[in-house]
A protein has these predicted regions:
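Alpha-helix N-capping/helix-start residues
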Residues: 17, 23, 55, 147, ...
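Short, amphipathic alpha-helical "lid/cap" segments that border enzyme active or binding sites
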Residues: 23, 27-30, 147, 281-288
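Active-site beta->alpha loop and helix N-cap motifs at the rims of alpha/beta catalytic domains
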Residues: 2-9, 13-142, 152, 294
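Catalytic cores of TIM-barrel enzymes
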Residues: 2-3, 175-178, 259
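C-terminal alpha-helical cap/extension of soluble enzyme domains
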Residues: 6-14, 36-38, 199, 206-294
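Glycine-rich phosphate-binding "P-loop"
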Residues: 136-137, 159-160, 270-271
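A general structural signal for well-ordered alpha-helical segments in protein cores
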Residues: 26, 58, 62, 87, ...
Length: 294
């Protein structure tokens, strides 16, 4: 059974002025996401600035989200690392704290071989028994999962149940689904490719857009599931200007700017990420207004 179906939010990590995690604000955001119809919370992912969090912060933020959500919807913990031992430790802590699943990004910077990726993921998943979702985003990690590697992992590692596919390559997605033969739950990792991936057999999205429009992304998925393909497609196309604006600078710079424009007060970003350029903010603001978010 899938961990979730529909729209999972890759939620931002709100920060105080001193750049500590703002748990009060995170609590508010979790409640708003649940009220907006989000189908799952993905905590401490790329959008959550996991790369600049300490292991202690990572574990504490994950634990907080699990406790506050309290089984109302699934919580998936981003526990990937470019260090296999670190990923194992984070994954074990997430399991102990009650996570419904883990999201495992490919090891960044190291540029592991495909055999290295198999060894990495196998080692992590042998240490836990909760479901694991692979995360393929080579544009950020410099390391991509090939379709045959995904198929091997899905076949040989029992608790690898899904993949967040953010390569942007529809052919890669099709090959993964073909080789896995119905044995993998595929989630779009790109907000501009949700409907195309659903059409190929995906079951949802792990979304940045959901931070600012949870009901919209949920509805786009469930229109598709209910057979209203035209309605879902229209929502996908209508959202493209905002999606483009949310990625005109590296994620999560624009989405934090968008949330602050909405009065959510999620704070700034940890270095080396910097505030969004003013010219880009104007483009983002217009796109949000055009979609009715502002």
């Amino acid at each position: 059974m899938a961990i979730f179906k529909g729209a999972g939010v890759a939620i931002v990590t709100p920060m105080k002025e001193n750049l500590e995690v703002n748990y009060d604000k995170l609590d508010e955001m979790l409640e708003e996401q649940i009220a907006g119809g989000t189908d799952a919370i993905v905590i401490c992912g790329t959008t959550g600035e996991s790369a600049t969090m300490t292991e202690e912060e990572h574990a504490a933020t994950t634990r907080f989200a699990i406790e506050r959500v309290n089984h109302r919807i699934p919580v998936i913990a981003g526990t990937g690392s470019n260090c296999t031992r670190t990923a194992i430790q984070l994954s074990k802590e997430a399991q102990e704290d009650g996570a419904d699943g883990i999201l495992l990004v490919t090891p960044y910077y190291n540029k592991a071989t495909q055999n290295g990726l198999i060894a990495h993921y196998t080692a992590i998943c042998n240490e836990v028994n909760i479901p694991a979702i692979l995360y393929n985003v080579p544009s950020r990690t410099g390391c991509g999962l090939q379709p045959q590697t995904v198929a091997t992992l899905v076949k040989d590692v029992e608790n690898i149940v899904g993949i967040k596919e953010a390569s942007g390559n529809i052919s890669t997605v099709a090959q993964i689904l073909h080789l896995c033969d119905g044995n993998v739950d595929l989630y779009s990792g790109n907000d501009d490719q949700v409907v195309p991936l659903l059409a190929l057999g995906g079951i949802g999205v792990i979304s940045v857009l959901s931070n600012v429009a949870p009901a919209y992304v949920h509805d786009m998925c469930y229109k598709f599931f209910s057979g209203d393909i035209a309605g879902s497609r229209k929502m996908q196309l209508d959202a493209l200007p905002l999606v483009d604006a949310l990625f005109c600078e590296v994620n999560p710079i624009p989405v934090k700017a968008a949330l602050n424009m909405m009065g959510k007060e999620v704070g700034t970003l940890r270095a080396p990420l910097t505030e969004m350029e003013d010219a880009h903010k104007e483009v983002l603001k217009k796109a949000m207004m055009d979609l009715g978010i502002l």
